[in-house]
Each structure stands twice: as C-alpha cells, then as structure tokens.
UniProtKB/Swiss-Prot annotation:
Gene Ontology MF terms in the entry: metallopeptidase activity; tripeptide aminopeptidase activity; zinc ion binding
Cofactor(s) the protein needs: Zn(2+)
Protein name: Peptidase T
One of the GO biological process terms: proteolysis
Family statement: Belongs to the peptidase M20B family.
Active site (UniProt): 83, 176 (proton acceptor)
Chain sites annotated for binding Zn(2+) 2: 142, 177, 381
Gene3D superfamilies: 3.30.70.360, Zn peptidases
Catalyzed chemical reaction(s): Release of the N-terminal residue from a tripeptide
Protein's organism: Streptococcus pneumoniae (strain Hungary19A-6)
Pfam families in UniProt: M20_dimer (PF07687), Peptidase_M20 (PF01546)
Entries under CDD domains matching the protein: M20_peptT
C-alpha cells in the first residue's frame, strides 16, 4: 500500500541532527534528541491520533492507541530510536531518486557514488524510489525510517477505524547507537505483552537473536628508561599491548567472521613506553562461548602478570547486553505473529541472527520480549546509506498487520 505522508515525514525527520555522543553523561546524550522528541515527535504523535502522549526523563516519547476491538486483547509495542550513528549528521540533504534505473547514483557533488559494482544490494531496487545522501552526511534511515513507519501506521489506523486492532503502545527513544538508550527504559510503564523494535534493514528481516556483548578496557603499565641503557630495565607498555593482542585467536576478528561466529575487536589503542591503554569489544551468540571469551582475556592478563612478576596488566570487563533469544524462545508468539503477517503480505521473512544488538536486547531482559523487524535501511552509519520508499511502505503494512492479527 502507498502512504502519501510517509516520504515527507521521513525527509523531515532526517534533516534534524540527532547524533548521539558516547562521551556525554546526560540522558539523552545530546540536547538535539530532547528537542527532536519534544518539538517534532510529540506534537506529531498527538496529530496522528495517539493518546496519553508524554515525554519521560529517560528520553522516551510514549503514546497509546487504544484497541477498537474488545476481542483483540493483546497489547503490542513498537519502538524506534531517535539518535543517529557517529558520522556527520549536520546538514543532511537527502536525494530522492524516483524509478531507479539500476545504474550508478552520484551522491550530490561530493565525488562519492553508489555503484552496484560496489553495493550489490542496489540490484534489488530497479524501478523503486530510493532516498540517498548527498555524500557529505549519513542519511539517518537508522532509525528514522522506523519512526516514520510507526507514525504512518498510527495515522492510517486512526483514519481507518474499520481496521480492527489491539492496543498499541509506541516508544521513541534515545542513544541506541551508543548502547545506553534502553538502560533506563521503563518496562512497567510501557506495559505491553510484547514489542518490536522497527530497526532492521532490508525487506523481510525478522530477528530475535543478537550477540551477547561485553567491553574490555586494558591498562598496561610500563617502565621507561633511556633506550641506550634499557636492557634488563625497560618495560615497554606498548609492547605489552602488542603481546596481549597477539595471544588472542588470530582469526576471531570482525573482518574474518560471519553468521554465528563471535569475535574480539580491538577498537582503540593509545599510549607510550610508560603506559598504554587498549579497548576491545567482545561478541558471541552462545552464552558459554561468550563467557569463555571473557575468561580467555582474563587468563592472558593473569599469565602476563605472572611472567612479568608484577601487576602490569589490568583488565576491566563490563557486560553490555545479552542475546535476547534466551528470553524470546520461551514464548515465540511475537515471531509467529510477525512471520504470519509477512507471509500473508507476500513478504518472505528473513530470520537470521543480528550481528549486533538492538534496544530489544535489553528490553527483552526487562520482561518485554522485543524482536526486531525490518525498517528498510541499507549501508547504514555512513555516506552510502540509502532506503527504498517501497520497503518502508511494506514495513507500515507489516505493523498494521501485526496489530490486526487475530491468530
């Protein structure tokens, strides 16, 4: 189905800079997200028909569309995030490419281009309307496509009361891209049987498995002496960092793994002879494998300290989120419903693990099973990001189908 306000709504959203800031200590991490929620989203939530609309101190804008059929007793939530990734989001100037011809798309005057030779996903979209960047910013389809789709679904349901639906709760939240947005999510206040994050990629994505995730911060304490007289005295902290890294499995890196394979990812290393620091992220799907990866890092640190005769390696491990499969597989209703709706719409569900996490990873462990469904974005988090309007329309169809489902 086509929705006349969907494209303009999406274009309005992406032109607002809502980039999050991992170094901030506030919630949300940037004032622009507060402004976007209070000045743009909340007024529109009221206009499209949501009731009891409010903004919480945790950064979530919340609203409800009451059920219009007493036989549909479920309460279902839909959640998308306001923030965009760590890439330029100031001055987003989207290009709308109607009836895409399957060829190269020049991204404004930036000198960058979307070429099917480099981005095979473009081969799916001839004849469709694509929204791209101008090459100087990201687009923000992650996750403003999700926000626009949820808002459009509510607007359509309000305008078409003949479509019977259950109670719907909507939540637009902050700081998903920096991994803290759902930390303060109020599951008791949201009060639904299950929910969906509308934060996926291509048409048909339906995901209920995520990584389990941890962060590792390492400090290496060296001893700096003049290199000319260093033998037997110098301890080079940078060399310690190298030695630590070289003891990790050589092939367990993001660029060498796929599917259900986990990894260690060195994010940053800084320092000097005197001291050095390294930051890693640890990812795996199975709980035992996840715990084994953390234990392996601790074992390497302990072994190095034993060999050095002092505590020159300090490791701090912090769990970040867990594989939501552990919660959702106990009651697969949200997957069964979404899968049936997609199939009824002629959409082939793509049920694959997310090699990442969503807000649903945390919200599921708060008591609300929250799998992820497609929102349409491709090449997210950078200048090559784009989205198909037709895929966004199908996401709206899917949301409407889920809340009207009687199975």
């Amino acid at each position: 189905m086509t929705y006349p306000n969907l494209l303009d709504r999406f274009l309005t959203y992406v032109k607002v800079n809502t980039r999050s800031d991992e170094h901030s200590t506030t919630t949300p991490s940037t004032q622009s997200q507060v402004d976007f929620a209070t000045n743009v989203l909340i007024p529109e939530m009221k206009r499209v028909g949501l009731q009891n609309v409010y903004y919480l101190p945790n950064g979530f804008a919340i609203g409800t569309l009451p059920a219009n059929d007493p036989s549909l007793t479920r309460k279902i939530g839909f959640i998308s995030h306001m923030d965009t990734a760590d890439f330029n989001a100031e001055g987003v100037n989207p290009q709308v490419i109607e009836n895409y011809d399957g060829g190269v798309i020049e991204l404004g005057n930036s000198g960058f281009k979307l070429d099917p030779a480099d981005f095979k996903s473009l081969e799916k979209y001839p004849g469709q309307t694509l929204i791209t960047t101008d090459g100087t910013t990201l687009l923000g389809a992650d996750d403003k496509s999700g926000i626009a789709e949820i808002m459009t679904a509510i607007e359509y349901l309000t305008a078409h009361p003949e479509i019977k639906h259950c109670e719907i709760r909507v939540g637009f939240g902050p700081d998903e891209e920096i991994g803290v947005g759902a930390n303060k999510f109020d599951a008791e206040d949201f009060d639904v049987d299950f929910a969906y994050t509308v934060d996926g990629g291509p048409l048909g994505e339906l995901q209920y498995e995520t990584f389990s995730a941890a962060g590792a911060e390492l400090h290496f304490q060296g001893r700096n002496v003049h290199p000319g007289t260093a033998k037997g005295q110098m301890v080079n902290a940078l060399q310690l960092a190298i030695d630590f890294h070289n003891q990790l499995p050589e092939n367990d890196r993001p660029e060498l793994t796929e599917g259900y394979q986990g990894f260690y990812h060195l994010m940053d290393v800084t320092g000097s002879v005197e001291e050095a620091r390294a930051s890693y992220i640890i990812r795996d799907f199975e709980k035992d494998a996840f715990e084994a990866r953390k234990a392996s890092m601790q074992s390497i640190a302990d072994k190095m300290n034993e060999e050095l005769g002092s505590n020159r390696v300090t490791l701090n491990l912090t769990d970040q989120y867990y594989n939501m499969k552990e919660v959702i597989e106990k009651d697969m209703t949200p997957i069964t419903v979404a899968k049936a709706v997609m199939e009824d719409l002629g959409i082939t569900p793509i049920i694959e693990p997310i090699r990442g996490g969503t807000d649903g990873s945390k919200i599921s462990f708060m008591g609300i099973p929250t799998p992820n469904i497609f929102a349409g974005g491709e090449n997210m988090h950078g200048r090559f990001e784009y989205v198909s309007l037709q895929t966004m329309e199908r996401a709206v169809d899917t949301i409407i189908g889920i809340v009207a489902y009687k199975g």
